[in-house]
UniProtKB/Swiss-Prot annotation:
Keywords: ATP-binding, Glycerol metabolism, Kinase, Nucleotide-binding, Transferase. ADP binds at residues 15, 19, 271, 314, 415, 419. PANTHER family: GLYCEROL KINASE (PTHR10196:SF69), SUGAR KINASE (PTHR10196). This is Glycerol kinase. InterPro entries: ATPase_NBD, Carb_kinase_FGGY, Carb_kinase_FGGY_CS, FGGY_C, FGGY_N, Glycerol_kin. It comes from Mycoplasma capricolum subsp. capricolum (strain California kid / ATCC 27343 / NCTC 10154). It catalyses: glycerol + ATP = sn-glycerol 3-phosphate + ADP + H(+).
């Protein structure tokens, strides 16, 4: 029986879909299953998910990936979880059911509330949490649920509510309600966590009026939290599997890219675009609009990172496809962009839900600048792809300033990293080498690596490094003066979108 091959199963719960992946010891993806779930937009700027639908979708993907691969649950050494961060779920402890839809990280309903704090409070929050007061983070979302759902405050007072980000919700469900935990990376994105003590902070809880009794216990990213409930995989199947990692999706990609040394950078192009640089055990405070975040943790050690968050990246391509209908699918954008020699000085600023790092303007809105009678569909498509690279470059530039050293190399992943036009433009505009690994599932691999390390599937980080293979490397093809001219136009365009909503009301 000892010769039976073992695997790691990863649950990758994203913003638009729930995925399940099976990985072997060599870092190969054996099977993948993906199911999309519904996006709800009840009002302008509001974004919600049905947490029950997320659970059902994730469970279905988990069962289907095992069926598809022919791998028995007994061959799974451990389950790792990675998730969309900040999205907040509050549920009733007695029924196990959410009292309101999950409020998604993109949601802007608390933007006005976030404007009400004085300078000293803003500085206190940044000093303690590493973050800024912004609708993006979970804390203000939880406050909104407690303040607006009938009887929620009373239920919280009676100890009948539980709050978690999606990882906590999934672990709670996977264990049949036995385990209520989170990890350092997800806890830190709530605005309620102190990066110096690595625990919930009473002053922050008081500021946002959130009772401590609704919060989960904080654990490391790599340890056994509990076991799946009997019957999870099929009726009558009593197999219970260790749940051995929990890590926010962007931190998971950093670990999956094996950016384990100080100064190493990864850029993930998903719905948004997220750039992290490892700062080791040092907490680096940003003076250039970035966030200080937990990178990952083990039982005895916490590592930190600087992060820049771009709200709209791949979502801008979805907008071209679904709203403007000028492309049939995302893959076509590379072809369209290559049909014109330049962007004809057209700039697209896709700040549909405001601007993230380094600007942090919740009231900016999207715009297209530089249109004339000669502008064609190809120019707009090209400018939209370029906008993704410009936004990432704004963050990479800020990172170089905070780290007091220019970023010369970064590793890329996410769906849009397959777009060669975008990757070459990114290399050009950032004047950096861009490296893409063969296995683009770096987010899932980070959680898999963490789970595998927790149960001894992999002995150490050196073993993990053997699994990393490079697909391509790109170097800049434009000179610095050419790039400076392009960036100047981008800066002008971005600045003209600032405070748009405020100024027209």
């Amino acid at each position: 029986m000892n010769n039976i091959k073992k695997y790691i199963l990863t649950l990758d719960e994203g913003t638009t879909s729930a995925r399940a992946l099976i990985t072997d010891k060599e870092g190969n993806i054996i099977a993948v299953e993906q199911s999309e779930f519904t996006q709800y937009f009840p009002k302008e700027g509001w974004v919600e998910h049905d947490a029950i639908e997320i659970w059902n979708t994730q469970r279905s993907a988990l069962v289907q990936v095992l069926n598809k691969s022919g791998i028995d649950p007994s061959q799974i050494e451990a389950i790792g979880i990675t998730n969309q961060r900040e999205t907040a779920v509050v549920w009733n402890k007695e029924t196990g059911l959410p009292i309101y839809n999950a409020i998604v990280w993109q949601d802007q309903r608390t933007a006005d509330y976030c404007q009400t704090f004085d300078k000293d409070t803003l500085e206190m929050v940044k000093q303690k949490s590493g973050l800024i007061i912004n609708p993006y983070f979970s804390g203000t979302k939880v406050k909104w649920i407690l303040d607006n759902v009938p009887n929620a405050r009373q239920l919280a007072k009676e100890g009948k509510l539980m709050f978690g980000t999606i990882n906590t919700w999934l672990i709670y469900r996977l264990t049949g309600g036995e385990v209520f935990v989170t990890d350092h990376t997800n806890a830190q994105r709530t605005l309620l966590y102190n990066i110096h003590t690595n625990d919930w902070d009473d002053e922050l809880l008081k500021l946002f009026d959130i009772p401590r009794n609704i919060l989960p216990e904080i654990k490391s990213c790599s340890e056994v939290y509990g076991y799946t409930f009997k019957g999870l995989f099929s009726k009558g199947n009593e197999q219970r599997i260790k749940i051995a990692s929990s890590i926010g999706d962007q931190q998971s990609a950093l670990f999956g890219q094996l950016c384990l040394e100080k100064g190493q950078v990864k850029v993930t192009y998903g719905t948004g675009c997220f750039i992290l640089t490892n700062t080791g055990e040092e907490i680096v405070k940003s003076n250039h609009g970035l966030l200080t975040t937990v990178a990952y943790s083990f039982k005895d050690k916490v590592y930190y990172a600087l992060e820049g968050s771009v709200m709209i990246a791949g979502a801008a391509v979805q907008w071209l496809r679904d709203n403007l209908r000028i492309v049939y699918n995302a893959i076509e954008t590379e072809w369209y962009a290559g049909q014109v020699k330049d962007d004809r000085r057209v700039y697209v600023v896709p700040s549909f839900t405001g601007l993230g790092s380094p600007y942090w303007d919740s009231f900016s809105r999207g715009a297209i600048f530089g249109l004339d009678r000669g502008t064609r569909r190809e120019h707009i498509v090209r400018a939209t792809l370029e906008a993704i690279a410009y936004q990432a470059n704004d963050v990479v530039d800020a990172m170089g300033k905070d780290m007091k050293k220019p970023i010369e190399i970064f590793k890329v992943d996410g769906g849009a990293a397959n777009n060669k036009f975008l990757m070459q433009f990114q290399s050009n505009i950032s004047q950096s080498k861009v490296i893409k690994p063969t296995n683009i599932e770096t987010t899932a691999m980070g959680a898999a690596f963490m789970a595998g390390l927790a149960v001894g599937y992999w002995e150490n980080v050196e073993e993990l490094k053997k699994t990393y293979k490079v697909h391509f490397e790109l170097t800049p093809e434009l000179s610095k003066p050419e790039v400076d001219k392009l960036i100047k136009g981008w800066k002008v365009a971005v600045q003209r979108t600032f405070k748009w909503v405020e100024e027209i009301e």
